[in-house]
Amino acid sequence: MRQLAFISARLGVPRFLVLLLILVFPLLPPFFLSGSAASAAPLALRQVAPGVYVHFGQHKDFEAGYDGDIANIGFVVGSEAVAVIDTGGSYATGMALKEALRAITLLPVRYVINTHGHPDHIFGNAAFMDDAGGAAPPQLIAHQRLPPFLARRGDQYRRNLARQLGDGAAGSLLIASTGGIGVGERLLLDLGGRQLALRAWPTAHTDHDLTVFDRASGALWTGDLLFIGRTPSLDGDLKGWLAATDALAGDRATLMIPGHGPVTRDARHALARQRDYLATLLRDVRADIAAHRDMTQSMATAAAAERGG
């Protein structure tokens, strides 16, 4: 009781309020806590090039044990600031990425870049917006078509996440940029002695794909324009994705960081594998349409021989 009286006197509040706080605080859910009280175990990171850090998502799908951690996410560190590239599939995953980042650098996060709006890449945005340590929150950057995409899909994504994660979905808000980069436009971001070149693509994997090229290391974050060791999933235009795959094959990047799967310095091989799959998928679907086959069955069997590579 002496300790209770001491705390009450120091805080200038009645004893019953101090006692209430002591009793209730341990019962608060994690998303009511701030700072280290709500911190998650940091994600495992790999430095794939100087100043370029990647967390590799697990090889799972959205139904088999999904926990918000299946996409490749990470960040690039300059001399003045940091850019985060994709934030994971939940607030908890985003917080774990932030914890890992803070173990490496205390530089401010100046930018959060979304390569596209699929839920496994974007639900962690809120983790970087809710606690800027007194500094201005980072600028959210994405393709200009991402905000309308999330306006259409957002409710569905939130319902799905609540079903998949239950209480683990707490704090997972869809926070998107208010503007964005238009198709064919490029944007240079300065992190201090380090520039990132962003490119907005025509419809391919989605209608709002964005890539991030780190000029200092030659590393290209492709988002889901490239899958390695995973079956590519289409939410855009198949012919457009083939065109984007061909364009990436001519890119000057020395290292490619895909949206899913391991990084590669042999991008031509990885892109050729993906192109074979997409081209076979297009051929098989066209053949099924010509034969008036059921499209549900077609999507289950098309390019079956190419999957898994």
Per-region residue spans from a language model:
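Active-site environment of divalent metal-dependent phosphoester hydrolases
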Residues: Y91-T93, G117-F123, P147-L150, T206-D209, ...
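Conserved beta-strand hairpin/beta-sheet module of binuclear metal-dependent hydrolase folds
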Residues: Q47-R102, L210-T222
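Active-site HxH/HxHxD metal-binding segment of metal-dependent hydrolases
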Residues: E99-G184, L188, R283
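Core dinuclear metal-dependent hydrolase active-site scaffold
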Residues: I181-D214
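Active-site neighborhood of phospho(di)ester-bond hydrolases with catalytic His/Asp-centered motifs
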Residues: I85-T87, R110-H118, I141-H143, W221-G223, ...
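Boundary at the C-terminal end of the N-terminal hydrophobic targeting segment
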Residues: A37-A40
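Bacterial N-terminal signal peptides
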Residues: F16-S34
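Divalent-metal (often Zn2+) His-rich catalytic cores of metallo-beta-lactamase-fold enzymes
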Residues: L242-R293, T301
